[in-house]
Amino acid sequence: TVPAMEGTSKGFTDTFDYELYDSPAANDPADGFSFNYGNAPVGDQGQAEEGMAGRPGVTENISFEVDTWRNNDAEQGVNISGLVDGQDVGQLAFTNGVILEDGSRKTGSMEIRWDPSKGATFYSTGLTTNADFTDVDTGAFVGDDGYNFIISARVGGANQDLFIDNLIITAGKPTPA
């Protein structure tokens, strides 16, 4: 958890470097991770690649998700989703595709932005299928300076490693990259 930051109700920009690794000849890579902004309490572990859906007391959230489970599965890929008034808003943006092949290592960076007047932006580099979403409408989602940032991840059967480094979160209206 990154605790609430003043100014995030006006938007934010998040950047970080990542490394994903899957050992060879084991089960498929699993399961994935997400970067979340919402009213989840400090310490909430989230639902990994499913964001914060179904977490007790979480009613407002925007989630930037990377699903690595089941190569070529219909739900595997990168997406933006969220919760508004406790209701799942579904996929706001989605690209289906393989993220991490068995026995491979992916390194790259991610840029995540939310602007209340423009929506959500999610870019990644280094994955087999990258996120490339710009100014996606986030509907009725409203930010709040009291919201926390949660990075949530899980590994099915311990078949994937995730490392995040150089995390920078800047509160305030995002500027284009």
Describe the residue ranges of each PLM region.
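Polar, low-complexity loop segments and adjacent catalytic/binding residues used for recognizing
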Residues: 1-174
